[in-house]
């Protein structure tokens, strides 16, 4: 198996057959110099919790882009984000924003998520059909993030376009030269935008997420300007396509299992379980990476220090050793902990908010549009990404009678 297999058109349409092959070749598959991959649930979970497995962001970029990666401003910016670094710097940076994503703070966002969903549906409810990605799934999380940051909602579309250009950074297969230029330009545009906003919040602080970040920074260790900008942008990136793509993936999974869709519509109190099961079945985040900080032994195989390990979360979530009938969607499933948000010290900080957003988005759609039906279920336009998996468009009939 090669890293380029993850950019194969057949894989991008349906990655799960390759994941089955990957799980059968345990413990690891070599995908290049100093690079391994695994999709077994037990191994993925164990390595996510292993303190000898950490982040070596530039090493993982060198695997994909060669030694010149360390000199690229885009990757230098990402290397300052707390999701790409190790303790103690990781602990400090994560702590600065953790207070905004506690259970209580996340739950307090539920009314905002519900209101945002209703407002978006108001714009297209009377139409016979609509592209739900463009009209709902993409603007929904971006508008929530903008409100959390007290950013002008009128800028949401521009910010979303810039973030989407950067999103391919998270793919295991390398971007083309043109894609890299577009991503770098988009990041610079975001950096300029948030530099102005951060300076404004320093002189006129509020109760928003950026002001909270700056207040926490003032009370603790000082950060460089570039560190602050990178981590504010990281919050924007982390909360956007992870959620927007998952709204589409969940609707697709449910419509491909009509009995499960009918069950959910008959009892919307099942929504939290349904969201978790859809995340397991076809999550937007398909993989994460760790690097061996020291030589470690895994199931009798040596993983040398510096080795980058691709942990395929999507494969782990379909592992029959962990989940009975893993290729079936079952919204009443109670077994197993899904890997969609990772685990260990880098477990997704915003997972509670993501779950609330997904619950509110889908519940409001089904309440307001009970006859919503996907129009082209067998001809979906997947976004050609092996990570942040989703569709570019999702045409739905809003008032179908059967």
Curated annotation (Swiss-Prot):
It comes from Xylella fastidiosa (strain 9a5c). PROSITE patterns: CYTOCHROME_P450. GO terms for molecular function: heme binding; iron ion binding; monooxygenase activity; oxidoreductase activity, acting on paired donors, with incorporation or reduction of molecular oxygen. Heme binds at residue 348. Belongs to the cytochrome P450 family. It is an enzyme of class 1 (oxidoreductase). Transmembrane segments: none annotated. Its cofactor is heme. Keywords: Heme, Iron, Metal-binding, Monooxygenase, Oxidoreductase. Its EC number is 1.14.-.-. CDD domains: CYP164-like. This is Putative cytochrome P450 133B1. InterPro entries: Cyt_P450 (IPR001128), Cyt_P450_B (IPR002397), Cyt_P450_CS (IPR017972), Cyt_P450_sf (IPR036396).
């Amino acid at each position: 198996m090669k890293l380029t297999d993850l950019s194969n058109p057949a894989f991008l349409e349906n990655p799960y057959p390759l994941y089955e092959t990957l799980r059968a070749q345990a413990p690891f598959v070599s995908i290049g110099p100093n690079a391994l991959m695994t999709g077994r649930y037990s191994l993925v979970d164990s390595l996510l919790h292993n303190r000898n497995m950490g982040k070596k962001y530039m090493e993982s970029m060198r695997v994909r882009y060669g030694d010149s990666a360390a000199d690229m401003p885009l990757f230098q910016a990402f290397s300052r984000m707390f999701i790409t670094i190790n303790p103690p710097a990781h602990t400090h940076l994560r702590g600065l924003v953790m207070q905004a994503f506690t259970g209580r703070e996340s739950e307090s966002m539920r009314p905002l998520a519900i209101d945002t969903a209703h407002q978006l549906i108001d714009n297209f409810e009377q139409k016979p059909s609509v592209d739900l990605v463009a009209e709902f799934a993409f603007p929904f999380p971006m508008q929530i993030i903008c409100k959390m940051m007290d950013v002008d909602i009128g800028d949401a579309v521009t910010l979303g376009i810039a973030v989407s250009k950067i999103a391919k950074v998270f793919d295991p297969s390398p971007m083309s030269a043109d894609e890299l230029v577009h991503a770098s330009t988009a990041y610079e545009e975001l950096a300029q935008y948030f530099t102005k906003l951060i300076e404004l919040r320093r002189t006129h602080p509020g109760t928003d997420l950026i002001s909270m970040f700056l207040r926490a920074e003032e009370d603790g260790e000082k950060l460089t300007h570039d560190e602050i900008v990178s981590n504010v942008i990281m919050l924007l990136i982390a909360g956007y396509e992870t959620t927007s793509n998952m709204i589409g993936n969940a609707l697709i999974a449910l419509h491909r299992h009509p009995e499960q869709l009918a069950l959910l519509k008959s009892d919307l109190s099942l929504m939290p379980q349904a969201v978790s099961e859809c995340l397991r079945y076809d999550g937007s985040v398909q993989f994460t990476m760790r690097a061996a900080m020291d030589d470690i032994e895994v199931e009798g195989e040596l993983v040398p220090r510096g080795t980058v390990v691709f942990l395929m979360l999507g494969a782990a979530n379909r592992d029959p050793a962990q989940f009975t009938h893993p290729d079936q969607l079952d919204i009443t499933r109670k077994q197993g902990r899904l890997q969609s948000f990772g685990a260990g010290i880098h477990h997704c900080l915003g997972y509670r908010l993501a779950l609330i957003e997904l619950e509110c988005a889908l519940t409001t759609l089904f309440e307001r549009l009970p006859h919503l039906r996907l129009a082209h279920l067998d001809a979906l336009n997947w976004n050609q990404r092996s990570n942040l998996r989703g569709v570019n468009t999702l045409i739905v009939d809003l008032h179908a009678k059967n």
